[in-house]
Amino acid sequence: MINIDELKKKIIYRSNYRGTKEMDNLLGAFTKKYINNLNENDLLDLEKLLNIDDTNLYNFYNGFKTDFEFETNNINSLYKNFDYKQK
């Protein structure tokens, strides 16, 4: 059985400490907005999303060509359509 609270903590940490400031900010804001509204399957999909390298995540978000085949699921759709306003 999955410990949802532990999974959320892991996801929050990984979202905010990616390696590039741009992706730290983008994924951190995305996770902060949605983390408490996600079901177990969505959390597992978000964990899978975080396993993708920053370049492909950035390109996918911005509609550029990627070297990765993104699944069609709720998380990828939310991420692709996330309205990130950098401060």
Labelled PLM ranges:
Residues 2-43, 47-87:
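Positively charged, polar, low-complexity stretches
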